[in-house]
């Protein structure tokens, strides 16, 4: 029993050290990925946004989660991870495949998946053994509610072309705001 405990402790320490040696440079790595994702989102546009003005909607982006001056790096990484995960979930539905260019969607999935992998290693490095991502549950919950509103909107609009155009533009806006958050994190370092 004692041997199992010490083995478990040793594995945790070794895992933590291996994550720490990854040298997480989130702002540089993630910002580049966000820019590529923004380019792909822009290329997905199928109709003019002006033809969808009547469908505009305020999804109540959780701006305060991206504006807080006291934002800790671990909290920012957790929020960014949740945003990327929810974006991945939103765009990986059969309804998005029907409305958007599948080749661009595939590239977008690959980009989001890479960002999620980068963020997961950063979360482990920044949060470590001391803190828990659950400490930032309010911030993560705000992001989840934001994406629930987007999903509800798409459902209410029956996944129309205009609804997808409005959502595409909204996700572009949220990615732009996350790039600004990363710039602030970089300036704090």
UniProtKB/Swiss-Prot annotation:
Q: List the disulfide bonds.
A: 24-122, 52-162
Any GO BP: B cell activation involved in immune response
Give its localization.
Answer: Secreted
Identify the GO cellular component terms for this protein. extracellular region; extracellular space
Q: SUPFAM superfamilies, per this entry? A: 4-helical cytokines
Which positions make up the signal peptide?
1-23
The record, for Pfam families, names: Interferon
Identify the domain of life.
Answer: Eukaryota
* UniProt KW keywords: Antiviral defense, Cytokine, Disulfide bond, Secreted, Signal
Which Gene Ontology MF annotations are present?
A: cytokine activity; cytokine receptor binding; type I interferon receptor binding
Q: What does this protein do?
A: Produced by macrophages, IFN-alpha have antiviral activities. Interferon stimulates the production of two enzymes: a protein kinase and an oligoadenylate synthetase.
The record's similarity note reads: Belongs to the alpha/beta interferon family.
List the PANTHER family.
Answer: INTERFERON ALPHA-8, TYPE I INTERFERON
Q: What is this protein called?
A: Interferon alpha-8
Query: Its encoding gene is what?
Result: IFNA8
């Amino acid at each position: 029993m004692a041997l199992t405990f010490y083995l478990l402790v040793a594995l945790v320490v070794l895992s933590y050290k291996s994550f720490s040696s990854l040298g997480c440079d989130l702002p540089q790595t993630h910002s580049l990925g966000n820019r590529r994702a923004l380019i792909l989102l822009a290329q997905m546009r199928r109709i003019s946004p002006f033809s969808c003005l009547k469908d505009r909607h305020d999804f109540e982006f959780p701006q305060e989660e991206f504006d807080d001056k006291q934002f800790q790096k671990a909290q920012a990484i957790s929020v960014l991870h949740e945003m990327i995960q929810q974006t991945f979930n939103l765009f990986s539905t059969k309804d998005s495949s029907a409305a958007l260019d599948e080749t661009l969607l595939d590239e977008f999935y690959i980009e989001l998946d890479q960002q999620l992998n980068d963020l997961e290693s950063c979360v482990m490095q920044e949060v470590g053994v001391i803190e828990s991502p659950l400490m930032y549950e309010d911030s993560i919950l705000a992001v989840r509610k934001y994406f629930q509103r987007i999903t509800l909107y798409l459902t209410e609009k029956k996944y129309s072309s205009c609804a997808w155009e409005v959502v595409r533009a909204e996700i572009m806006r949220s990615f732009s705001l996350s790039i600004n958050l990363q710039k602030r994190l970089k300036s704090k370092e």
